[in-house]
């Protein structure tokens, strides 16, 4: 198994505050790995450490087999980054923003139109960035991040400003990139997004990883022996798979109040709340 990312016993402190505590992650090459947690949990700090924008306090960090010890530790031609501080040149057009990075990455210029078409911005390529909406800027930043077909793509809340249609399109782009071999490290607080994209996910709370597995295994691990019923007034009830539960269902059926019966499977959101005691 070849690892794209390794974090061993990583800690990060800012003065008296500990932002990350004993973080251990191994991300395989070709994997889409989700890092889930609420605002302030340490997701962005982790991305900054992995992309050499911030130095960890304790532990070992490796990206593409190289120890991360400072800005010169990482080959930026092999990674793509989308974060809140992935700045664009406001006075330049969309096309010229990407052209600058095309030169840095030694890409063919034809690749610019290709990625702009993917993010539905080809018709706007001459528009200055300062005239774009927040969602359009986010798509430009993604286009820039995938311009050179990186080995690893780091995405910090990549669809937070997008409408559902563009979210669906971005998800397709990411899946296609992954099929071509790109490893993706994705931070999000959107459980549906994690479910759609990720091979494995880690739950981060207050700087600590509290669960890590595939979405399927997490659901199985935290599944309860319960059934969910829907009554005529659209009210949902959850009952145990036991004698008392069977009796309650029988009573609803006799009264003609029962509409449907469903097996109960926890969502990732349910599991996160159970593990951490808080929501996203």
Q: Predicted regions span which residues?
A:
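Conserved ABC ATPase "signature" region
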Residues: 99, 103, 109-125
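Short, charged/small-residue-rich alpha-helical element at the C-terminal edge
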Residues: 217-280
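Catalytic Walker B motif of ABC-type/P-loop ATPase nucleotide-binding domains
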Residues: 153-157
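Conserved ABC transporter NBD signature motif
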Residues: 59-70, 74-75
């Amino acid at each position: 198994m070849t690892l794209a990312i390794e974090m061993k016993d990583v800690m990060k402190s800012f003065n008296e505050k500990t932002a990350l505590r004993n973080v251990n992650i191994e991300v395989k090459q070709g994997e889409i790995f989700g890092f889930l947690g609420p605002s302030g949990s340490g997701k962005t700090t982790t991305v900054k450490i992995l992309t050499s924008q911030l130095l960890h306090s304790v532990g070992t960090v490796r990206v593409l087999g190289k120890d991360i010890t400072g800005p010169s530790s990482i080959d930026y031609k092999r990674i793509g980054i989308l974060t809140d501080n992935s700045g664009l040149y406001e006075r330049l057009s969309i096309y010229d923003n990407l052209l600058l990075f095309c030169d840095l990455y030694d890409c063919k210029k034809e690749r610019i139109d290709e990625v702009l078409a993917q993010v539905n911005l080809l018709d706007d390529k001459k528009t200055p960035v300062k005239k774009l909406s927040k969602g359009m800027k986010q798509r430009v930043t993604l286009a820039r991040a995938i311009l050179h077909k990186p080995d690893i793509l780091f995405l910090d809340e990549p669809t937070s400003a997008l409408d559902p249609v563009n979210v669906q399109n971005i998800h397709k782009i990411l899946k296609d990139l992954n099929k071509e071999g790109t490893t993706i490290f994705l931070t999000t607080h959107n459980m549906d997004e994690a479910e759609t994209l990720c091979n494995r996910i880690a739950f981060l709370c207050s700087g600590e990883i509290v669960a890590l597995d595939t979405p399927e295994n997490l659901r199985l691990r935290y599944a309860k022996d319960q059934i969910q019923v829907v009554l005529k007034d659209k009210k949902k009830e959850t009952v145990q798979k036991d004698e008392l539960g069977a009796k309650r269902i029988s009573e609803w059926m006799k009264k003609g109040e029962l509409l449907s019966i469903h097996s109960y499977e926890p969502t990732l959101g349910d599991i996160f709340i159970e593990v951490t005691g808080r929501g996203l």
